[in-house]
Amino acid sequence: MGLLLVIVLVTLVFKATGTAGRSFGRLQDELQLQEARRHILAQLEKTVCYDAQSVRLQDDGKISCRMLEGCKQVTVYSDKQGIYQRTRTNKGTGVNPVSLEEVGVFGWQVRRCSPQMLCVSFDLYRNGRSMRVMQYFICYSARITDDA
């Protein structure tokens, strides 16, 4: 009888910790998606809204910015389930990730809403969980043009 009680208690404990573990995993995934969203939007806001002198939306979804800081060109684009920023200066070119490595980015779209307003939308994915992101940016120092 005592052995049966121990087996039942151990089974209940394992089920409870398994459920708690899965819930904790889902919570971690949700927090990671929120952090990725915040990080991407903050980087885009800094680049497009504050530091750009001109913004050009390319047909392939790239955002090309000429920066207030002289002789600097920044292009933001989506590639291989991530968002990247290519920076060109007189001294050379470099590429840095804007998105977090642990979170996939899909469905990247950009469109001009007005001469100074830009809409960016994309989906974030992590371990089967997803989040749709859509944000409007007002370019304070730049005018937005489209490829025609």
Where do the model's predicted regions map?
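Beta-strand-rich extracellular modules
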Residues: 123-127
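Aliphatic-rich helix starts adjacent to a transmembrane/signal segment
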Residues: 1-42
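Broad hydrophobic/π-residue packing in well-ordered secondary structure
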Residues: 17, 24, 43-46, 74-81
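Short, cationic motifs built from Arg/Lys/His that form the positively charged side of catalytic pockets
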Residues: 49, 82-86, 141
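Short, low-complexity, Pro/Ser/Thr/Gly-rich segments in the mature regions of secreted, periplasmic
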Residues: 134-148
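Alpha-helix exit/C-cap motif
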Residues: 39-60
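Type IV pilin-like appendage domain
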Residues: 54-119, 129-132, 147-148
